[in-house]
Each structure stands twice: as structure tokens, then as C-alpha cells.
Curated annotation (Swiss-Prot):
Keyword Cytoplasm: yes
Assembly description: Monomer. Binds 30S ribosomal subunits, but not 50S ribosomal subunits or 70S ribosomes.
Record field: transmembrane: none
Taxonomic path: Bacteria, Pseudomonadati, Pseudomonadota, Gammaproteobacteria, Enterobacterales
Gene3D superfamilies according to UniProt: 3.30.300.20
UniProt name for this protein: Ribosome-binding factor A
Subcellular location: Cytoplasm
Organism name: Salmonella arizonae (strain ATCC BAA-731 / CDC346-86 / RSK2980)
GO molecular function, one term: ribosomal small subunit binding
Gene: rbfA
Length: 133
């Protein structure tokens, strides 16, 4: 029977919570003025590397997103040291931050589906109008 929820997944889940707390309370970088959310963490099998996926409250501005990711990368050593104290791991993983655009893509897809459904309902209500298109 295979492990469904192994150690890397458990460590990643706990690390996600701890990094979110650290970003909220400890990081005072002005480039991170927008609210930062940790949407996920992926751990390597040997727990030496972690990919941290983040989203920002005001993610419409690409320059602000790039500046935010750069600020997180520059603060990764500090975040790592705080993470080591909070989690008491033998090896604190090397952190790499990525912007998670899945939320934005999900909203875009939801809007597309909503528009199609609305258009379909309009065609059902007014079948004569659709023949003119």
C-alpha cells in the first residue's frame, strides 16, 4: 500500500502555514506592500528544495508582481532562518518563489463559462434573434 500523504507533503503543508505567518508578521519590505498569499508549497523528495507559490492582492500590475517575487527571493535567506526556528528541521530547504497565476486563470475561465451560459440563455429566450447573426 503506497503512502498517500508522505513526509514531503506533510512538511510542505506545515511550511505553507509558517511562511504565510512569516510574510504577514516579519517581512517589512515596501515592495510587498500588497497582501501576499502563499497558495502552495512543493517539496523535493529529499526536503532540500521547496517551490513556494504566491499570489498578490493587487496582481493586475505585472511590474508589481515581478518586484514582489524579486523581493521574496532576496528575503528568502531571512525567511529560511525564521522557518528553521519555527519548524526545527535538520535541513531547512532552499526556497524558490513563483507567482501562481492559477487563481487568475480560474477566474478568467469562470467568466468565459458565465458569458457562454448567458449568451445561450438569451438565444433560448429570443430564438428569432439568433438567426440574424
Amino acid at each position: 500500500m503506497a503512502k498517500e500523504f508522505g513526509r514531503p507533503q506533510r512538511v510542505a503543508q506545515e511550511m505553507q502555514k509558517e511562511i504565510a505567518i512569516i510574510l504577514q508578521r516579519e517581512i517589512k519590505d515596501p515592495r510587498l506592500g500588497m497582501m501576499t498569499t502563499v497558495s502552495g508549497v512543493e517539496m523535493s523528495r529529499d526536503l532540500a528544495y521547496a517551490k513556494v507559490y504566491v499570489t498578490f492582492l493587487n496582481d493586475k500590475d505585472e511590474d508589481a508582481v515581478k518586484a514582489g517575487i524579486k523581493a521574496l527571493q532576496e528575503a528568502s535567506g531571512f525567511i529560511r532562518s525564521l522557518l528553521g526556528k519555527a519548524m526545527r528541521l535538520r535541513i531547512v530547504p532552499e526556497l524558490t518563489f513563483f507567482y501562481d497565476n492559477s487563481l487568475v486563470e480560474g477566474m478568467r475561465m469562470s467568466n468565459l463559462v458565465t458569458n457562454v451560459v448567458k449568451h445561450d440563455e438569451e438565444r433560448r429566450v429570443n430564438p428569432d434573434d439568433s438567426k440574424e447573426d
